[in-house]
């Protein structure tokens, strides 16, 4: 594998051809001698030399040949075929969006001035951006977060525009008990608490990831609560500073959402956000490694996990409450099919297909956001389904 990788690296440099061909070939051949013992056969240097020289001679004719879709779009063949079948009119656009450079998108904290205040701080710092959605700002150029005014004090957080739809769809209200079932790294939890004076239970099965939730909530200036705390919970206030009487803050738990018996106190939740584990097929531009370590068979495994989590969490929702099912996937086996099967089995469940994100002109009726990168839209791929529980 190391020798093949070295050969591919040499060919990639010959295609780019920013340096003289003899230099590229010579340095690649020399690199063979730097490989670990046993990684290359005795004639490897000569083999690399010969193949690169031939590639350099025949490069024009080789590159003129039409590439298979797998090579042209740099996606596994099964992935290309699947997307092409699902969206025959948009498949190339979807694949190219997944290969685009992901922008740095920010979410303005509504409790610290919101989108307009964040925009003013960016303008003052000479940072180019465009407003998107109710709380979003997309930077013209990505920057380290320590150079973004307002990040350290929690007035802005990094979050994709598509991911910001979760809290807006769930629509938290003052005084409610809300469960964020798979909460790490905590962006959606913080957004819920920025929107309303509510009490959120934020869970993650991994203690290290639960710690990340805590860190992000502290930066966003959200009170951290505990189910057995001796400290006073955060007091919610109006814009004028008057107390509302509601509890405002987050309980962060390292717990398994699929095993409620181990952590649930028996009190039903008004709203539940289930951002379920998935293939991550909608966020490839941020995690390109997903393309090559994800296997076709993984989708069925994720679907089973998603269905199990829905079954386990539904009893925790009060009658009249709402559950938002979300994944960062573009495959219907993890989205529409999971929800349809669950709703057909659950007599007290209604899928609210008509719900839209406020201000989103062309929100997809089925809730499947596809990756897009253009003037009007700049977001990853997500699936959202809002489920209501009959009284």
PLM features: residue spans?
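S-adenosylmethionine
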Residues: 1-391
């Amino acid at each position: 594998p190391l020798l093949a990788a070295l050969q591919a690296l040499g060919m990639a440099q010959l295609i780019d051809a920013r340096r003289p061909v003899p230099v590229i070939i010579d340095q690649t051949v020399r690199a063979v001698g730097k490989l670990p013992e046993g990684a290359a056969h005795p004639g490897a240097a000569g083999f690399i030399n010969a193949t690169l020289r031939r590639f350099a001679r025949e490069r024009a004719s080789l590159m003129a040949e039409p590439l298979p879709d797998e090579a042209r779009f740099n996606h596994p063949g099964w992935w290309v075929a699947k997307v092409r079948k699902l969206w025959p009119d948009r498949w190339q656009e979807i694949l190219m969006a997944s290969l685009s450079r992901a922008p740095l998108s920010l979410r303005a904290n509504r409790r610290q001035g919101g989108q307009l205040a964040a925009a003013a701080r960016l303008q003052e710092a000479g940072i180019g951006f465009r407003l998107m959605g109710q709380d979003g700002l997309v930077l013209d150029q990505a920057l380290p977060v320590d150079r973004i005014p307002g990040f350290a004090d929690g007035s802005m957080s990094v979050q994709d525009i598509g991911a910001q739809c979760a809290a807006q769809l769930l629509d938290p209200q003052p005084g409610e008990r809300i469960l964020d079932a798979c909460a790490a790294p905590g962006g959606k939890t913080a957004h819920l608490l920025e929107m309303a004076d509510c009490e959120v239970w934020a869970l993650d099965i991994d203690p290290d990831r639960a710690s990340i939730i805590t860190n992000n909530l502290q930066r966003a200036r959200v009170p951290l609560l505990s189910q057995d705390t001796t400290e006073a919970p955060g007091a919610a206030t109006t814009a004028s500073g008057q107390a509302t009487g509601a509890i405002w803050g987050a309980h962060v738990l390292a717990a398994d959402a699929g095993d409620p018996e181990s952590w649930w106190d028996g009190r039903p939740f008004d709203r539940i956000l289930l951002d379920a584990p998935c293939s991550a097929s909608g966020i490839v531009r941020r995690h390109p490694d997903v393309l090559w370590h994800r296997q076709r068979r993984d989708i069925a495994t994720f679907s089973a996990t998603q269905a199990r989590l829905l079954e386990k969490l539904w009893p925790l929702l009060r009658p009249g409450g709402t559950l938002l099912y979300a994944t960062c996937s573009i495959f219907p086996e993890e989205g529409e099919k999971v929800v349809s099967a669950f709703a057909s089995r659950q007599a007290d469940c209604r899928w609210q297909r008509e719900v839209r994100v406020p201000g989103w002109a062309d929100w997809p009726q089925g809730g499947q956001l596809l990756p897009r990168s253009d003037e009007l839209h700049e977001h990853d791929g997500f699936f959202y389904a809002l489920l209501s529980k009959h009284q």
